[in-house]
């Protein structure tokens, strides 16, 4: 058991080291931070969606924006489209599960907002449809994806694809990236500038 535990920890570290060592990922994260900062400066909001563990990540990241990450500061508008069971089940029943995020993007999204769709496989149909609807409205779309980015990468403005085939490692990297984004956005907007 000890060897298995150590192997899992090493695997997690290796996935993150791939991101750290490839300057492309650092630049992509920086671009995402800048997009979110610009949206907030313009009085816009961030919408987030995902399935399963990615739904939990959506809620986690939204909570960091609305409550706080490190600093006591003004709340930032962020909505996880995964939390209203009445809306989710109504859309799933009356339309289809594939439409659960698309309909909410149509209802809550405004031009200039940001949508972060999270999918470890990159092949979540409901994320693809949410991205398509967001583009119709004029919402900037960001994908936190895994594996090869799947179909989702073709429908978002900024796909960030974690370089791993292992779902748990992708999920761990997604929440790490979410934390980095929240941390820098908060610092930049509320007086603690981050060094280049």
Swiss-Prot record:
Species of provenance? Clostridium acetobutylicum (strain ATCC 824 / DSM 792 / JCM 1419 / IAM 19013 / LMG 5710 / NBRC 13948 / NRRL B-527 / VKM B-1787 / 2291 / W)
Kindly state one GO CC term assigned in the UniProt record: cytoplasm
Q: By its UniProt entry, which InterPro entries does this protein fall under? A: GmhA/DiaA (IPR035461), Phosphoheptose_Isoase (IPR004515), SIS_dom (IPR001347), SIS_dom_sf (IPR046348), SIS_GmhA/DiaA_subfam (IPR050099)
Which GO terms label this protein's molecular function in UniProt? carbohydrate derivative binding; D-sedoheptulose 7-phosphate isomerase activity; zinc ion binding
Top enzyme class: isomerase
Q: What does this protein do?
A: Catalyzes the isomerization of sedoheptulose 7-phosphate in D-glycero-D-manno-heptose 7-phosphate.
Q: Give a yes or no for keyword Acetylation in this entry.
A: no
Q: Which compartments is it annotated to reside in?
A: Cytoplasm
Look up keyword Iron-sulfur and say if it applies.
no
Q: What is this protein called?
A: Phosphoheptose isomerase
Gene3D superfamilies, alphabetized: Glucose-6-phosphate isomerase like protein, domain 1
Report any Pfam family annotated for this entry: SIS_2
**Annotated substrate binding sites:** 51-53, 64, 93-94, 119-121, 124, 171
A GO term (biological process) for this protein? carbohydrate metabolic process
Alphabetized SUPFAM superfamilies for the sequence = SIS domain
Q: Which residues form the SIS domain?
A: 36-195
Quote the record's miscellaneous comment: The reaction produces a racemic mixture of D-glycero-alpha-D-manno-heptose 7-phosphate and D-glycero-beta-D-manno-heptose 7-phosphate.
Positions annotated to bind Zn(2+): 60, 64, 171, 179
Question: Its family?
Answer: Belongs to the SIS family. GmhA subfamily.
UniProt keyword annotations, A-Z: Capsule biogenesis/degradation, Carbohydrate metabolism, Cytoplasm, Isomerase, Metal-binding, Zinc
Q: How is the cofactor bound?
A: Binds 1 zinc ion per subunit.
């Amino acid at each position: 058991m000890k060897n298995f535990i150590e192997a899992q920890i090493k695997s997690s570290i290796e996935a993150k080291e791939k991101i750290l060592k490839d300057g492309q990922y650092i630049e992509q994260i920086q671009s995402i931070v800048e997009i979110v900062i610009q949206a907030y400066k313009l009085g816009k909001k961030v919408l987030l969606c995902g399935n399963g563990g990615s739904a939990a990540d959506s809620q986690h990241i939204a909570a960091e924006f609305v409550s706080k990450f490190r600093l006591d500061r003004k709340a930032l508008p962020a909505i996880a489209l995964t939390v209203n069971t009445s809306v989710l089940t109504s859309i799933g029943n009356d339309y289809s599960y594939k439409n659960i995020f698309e309909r909410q993007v149509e209802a809550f999204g405004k031009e200039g907002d940001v949508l972060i769709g999270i999918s470890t496989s990159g092949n979540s149909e409901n994320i693809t449809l949410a991205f398509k609807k967001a583009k119709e409205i004029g919402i900037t779309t960001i994908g936190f994806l895994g594996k090869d980015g799947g179909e989702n990468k073709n429908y978002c403005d900024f796909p960030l694809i974690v370089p791993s085939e292992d779902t748990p490692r992708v999920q761990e990297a997604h929440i790490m990236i979410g934390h980095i984004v929240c941390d820098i956005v908060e610092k930049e907007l509320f007086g603690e500038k981050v060094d280049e």
